[in-house]
């Protein structure tokens, strides 16, 4: 069926010393502009080849105005912890106020080998109300519900079902 979207992970220089200077300015000045320009480049290519489709581009970095390129940002490689989950609501609200309406997170958290069934379910419950519902994690702990114990899997299934019930809205 082809490609329905693109994932531009690491759309910013991950290791870029503050003292580095480029034609566009210092590293700190252009850090997020790099992701913005990458999203623009992808969107322009997407429109060239798929002119009748709205771009679907997952990007981790951007800048003011990046939403015009069909960019759907997530909060990055967030800690798989209660503190990691707690910060997601504020981040999503702030990004929404800045025009990034498709803001979301790696459901379940991304980084670390810590796993807590209760934390995972709470993150899935939060994700039901996000514009993008996407469990994703580093390889240390699988993010997909199918790899969880039977009780956690059943609870996650309820969240997925609720998500599908809400989709028409």
Predicted feature residues:
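Catalytic-domain carbohydrate-binding cleft regions of carbohydrate-active enzymes
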Residues: 1-169
């Amino acid at each position: 069926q082809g490609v329905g979207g693109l994932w531009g992970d690491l759309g910013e220089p991950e290791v870029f010393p503050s003292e580095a200077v480029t034609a566009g300015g210092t590293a700190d000045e252009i850090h997020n502009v790099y992701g913005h320009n990458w999203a623009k480049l992808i969107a322009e290519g997407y429109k060239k080849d798929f002119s009748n489709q709205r771009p679907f581009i997952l990007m981790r970095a951007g800048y003011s105005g990046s939403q015009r390129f069909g960019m759907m940002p997530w909060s990055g490689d967030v800690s798989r912890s209660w503190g990691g989950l707690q910060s997601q609501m504020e981040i999503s609200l702030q990004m929404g106020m800045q025009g990034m309406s498709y803001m979301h997170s790696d459901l379940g958290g991304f980084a670390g080998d810590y796993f807590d069934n209760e934390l995972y379910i709470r993150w899935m419950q939060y994700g039901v109300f996000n514009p993008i519902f996407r469990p994703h994690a580093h390889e240390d702990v699988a993010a997909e519900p199918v790899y969880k114990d039977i009780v956690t899997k059943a609870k996650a299934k309820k969240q997925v079902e609720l998500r599908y019930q809400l989709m028409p809205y």
